[in-house]
Design a protein with these regions (language model features):
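Short hydrophobic beta-strand segments
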Residues: 2-6, 153-156
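Active-site helix-to-loop segments that bind/position phosphate- or nucleotide-bearing substrates
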Residues: 4-89
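Internal, well-folded beta-alpha domain core
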Residues: 86-242
Length: 242
């Protein structure tokens, strides 16, 4: 069983560095494509300020020149979902579960264990980067599938942009999750609630050592309860009262 989570734009480098691993062939090809951009071109590519573009340019060049500092990916990313994941003070069993089951899907590094070394970078599958004439999704599809081909059960906490990198065959093994808020009988979904809930849900999976869909259905976390009436075999819905 594997649990998939996406990367995040926000990063926190206030952690001890760890040793880098050599970039895999697919990652090197992506980096080579990114390295063609000047800082001013990155401003347009990323749709960010000149200052942010300079920062990203420095990140790319540092990776290219093997100067980049690397951090455990789960600690490097610091978006809303990540801030709601239990990342410190884990028991030995929780640490083992995290290492064995949680994978991060990256447009630069591929599908990798959650504590793999990553350098600060900004890239997702909505960005129109061409790698050897292919889109990012096409470039990564076979490697993404390969990472999960032996898995019978996959819990996906990904957004659709990441899920659609995988083939239909792999996606059919995925159990997805929806987190909703009940406001006076009206069920609402919004980004902030979903991101926080994904982090809290992953924490519950880790703490309870969940291995099956049946175990996942029994979880209660951050005010969320499983709603069988709204769920299906491959989509579990959890609702909290507003």
């Amino acid at each position: 069983m594997k649990i998939l989570i996406p990367t995040a734009k926000e990063m926190n480098t206030d952690h001890p560095c760890i040793e880098a691993l050599p970039l895999r062939e697919e990652s090197q090809a992506v980096l080579d494509s990114l390295a063609h951009y000047s800082a001013s071109e990155l401003e347009t590519f990323y749709k960010v300020s000149a200052e942010k573009a300079e920062e990203e340019y420095a990140h790319i060049q540092a990776l290219k020149d093997h100067r980049a500092k690397h951090y455990p990916a789960l600690k490097l990313f610091d978006g809303l979902m990540y801030r709601h994941i239990k990342r410190d003070g884990l028991t030995e069993a929780e640490q083992t579960y995290l290492e064995n089951h949680v994978l991060i899907t990256s447009a630069l590094y591929g599908v990798v264990p959650a504590l793999s070394p990553m350098a600060p970078h900004r890239l997702d599958f909505l960005m129109k980067l061409k790698v050897a004439g292919k889109t990012l999704k096409s470039h990564w599809k076979s490697a993404y599938d390969e990472a999960l081909q032996d898995e019978d059960l996959i819990f996906s906490l990904l957004s659709s942009e990441f899920e659609t990198v995988f083939s239909k065959e792999i996606r059919e093994k995925m159990v997805t999750f929806k987190f909703m808020e009940d406001k006076g009988g009206q069920l609402k979904i919004h980004s902030t609630i979903s991101k926080k809930a994904r982090g809290a849900f992953l924490t519950a999976l880790i703490e309870e050592q969940v291995q099956t869909v049946e175990q996942a259905r029994k979880l209660r976390f951050a005010g969320f309860d499983y709603r069988p009436d709204l769920s299906s075999d491959l989509e579990l819905v959890f609702v909290k009262q507003a």
